[in-house]
């Protein structure tokens, strides 16, 4: 499967883990030949979107059924090593149990040898597409498989207040 020449393939694990393989290209790096944060976040978003689609929470379903959309509220990333041009990487993502307003999702980036080179965690919420107000997470029904208890980062964001 190819998307803009970047996605090399997807791997759906039994359970909540979802993977995408990417090849880092010239447009993905900065003048130091290291991955741009904007590209990393784009790949995180694409991989999370595909994983959400698999769980019944894709963009089309949310918009048509519930008149809501995903919005990224917070993200934290720790980079041990930045991938270089022509390097193949695998992005893994998995959700955690939802809160009242928020959905937490973790990420790992592995190099071709399987070493974890980047870790991330994020907080997402639902926003009403008409009123632009936050909506409770219980509004939608996601088909969650068993959760992975492992966290990519030992970091807790401050909870949202309704």
Which stretches of residues belong to each language-model region?
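Hot-dog-fold acyl-thioester-processing enzymes
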Residues: 2-72, 121, 128-162
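Hydrophobic, ordered structural segments
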Residues: 108-110, 116, 123-131
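Hydrophobic beta-sheet segments that form the core/acyl-binding groove
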Residues: 75-113
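Short coil/turn motifs at beta-sheet boundaries
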Residues: 15, 68-70, 86, 100, ...
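Hydrophobic residues positioned within well-ordered beta-strands of beta-sheet architectures
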Residues: 18-20, 75, 91, 105, ...
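A broad, structure-centric signal for solvent-exposed, well-ordered loop/edge residues
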Residues: 31, 36, 42, 79, ...
């Amino acid at each position: 499967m190819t998307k803009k020449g970047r996605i090399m393939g997807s791997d759906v694990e039994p359970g909540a883990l979802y993977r995408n393989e990417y090849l880092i290209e010239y447009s993905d790096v900065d003048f130091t030949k290291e991955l741009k944060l904007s590209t990393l976040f784009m790949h995180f978003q694409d991989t999370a979107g595909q994983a959400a689609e698999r769980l019944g929470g894709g963009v089309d379903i949310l918009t048509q059924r519930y008149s809501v959309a995903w919005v990224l509220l917070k993200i934290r990333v720790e980079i041990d090593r930045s991938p270089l041009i022509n390097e193949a990487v695998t992005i893994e993502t998995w959700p955690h149990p939802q809160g009242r307003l928020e959905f937490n999702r973790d990420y790992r980036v592995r190099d071709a040898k399987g070493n974890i080179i980047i870790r991330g965690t994020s907080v997402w919420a639902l926003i009403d597409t008409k009123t632009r107000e936050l909506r409770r997470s219980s509004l939608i029904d996601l088909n969650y498989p068993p959760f992975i208890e492992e966290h990519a980062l030992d970091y807790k964001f401050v909870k949202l207040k309704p």
